[in-house]
Amino acid sequence: MIRIEPYSDKEVKSVLTNLMNNQEFMKFIKSNLNKSTSKFLSIPGSSLMVMQLFKSKIKNINSVKEFQDQVKLVLKSVVDQTIEEFQTKGLDNLESNKPYLFIGNHRDITLDSALCNFALDSIGQDTTFNAIGDNLVSVDWMGDLLRLNKSFVISRSGASKKEIYTNLLKASEFIKNKLDGGNHVWIAQKQGRSKDGIDKTDPAVLKMLHIALRKTCDFQEITNYYNIVPCSISYEIDPLAVEKSQQLQNTKSKDLDEDISHIFKGVMLNKGRVKLCFADQIQGAYSPESLAH
């Protein structure tokens, strides 16, 4: 069974220690130090120095917050170096101390939720717990990194309908538990990225959210229990436009590690201007289909 929950503070140190001893992870980090965009990294021996600095920082991390503090520094650098202008709209409408369920469009595997958190942090809001697919934890070290960063897994696979339902129930209960505890949650509006640029919410995602509430309320009352806020992000330049086009045209088969390479390419390459908009909180009674539209 796939673990759904992210890591807790008490697990952080041991997980990071295992990562530092994971040769596959360390090799990937070293091979992805971008010499083409850094004059320092073009100096002989500089990559080794960066790796030692990386390891020393990791040793001082003892909690999820401390890990996210380091992620925040990296993300700030990504925004400064790969985004020409980052605009937000609707942040002023978010109330403090109110747990929101953000349902977002999905263009980039990790940046959509990361930039949502970047925006929330800028106004003093807590970061979200982020929903990810089980495909992203198929490589152990990537699963570790994502779980350290408050990601939880929604598994839609299973040997039987009962197993699939059980997995979705666990995810729904996790989301309910976090929202009830005063935490924000981010989830994509549908499974997989919008490779064709069409953003459309899948009613199945909304039905999954209601599973944990089925004994409490009808679906039409879900907006009385969850503070649902749609959010939408747009990238002027998509670093993975070619790859998405190839997948749409079935001209390129998907490799096992393709998601990982797409994550790093999406993070490291130029994105031009980026805009993130938060809509008003949804009120009223809806069916899954009407809420999706």
Please tell me what each predicted stretch does.
Residues 1-100, 106-117, 121, 143, ...:
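Membrane-anchoring hydrophobic helices of lipid-metabolizing enzymes
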Residues 74, 78-282:
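Soluble catalytic domains of membrane acyltransferases
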Residues 283-287:
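Hydrophobic alpha-helix feature that most strongly marks membrane-spanning transmembrane helices
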Residues 288-293:
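Long, compositionally biased intrinsically disordered regions
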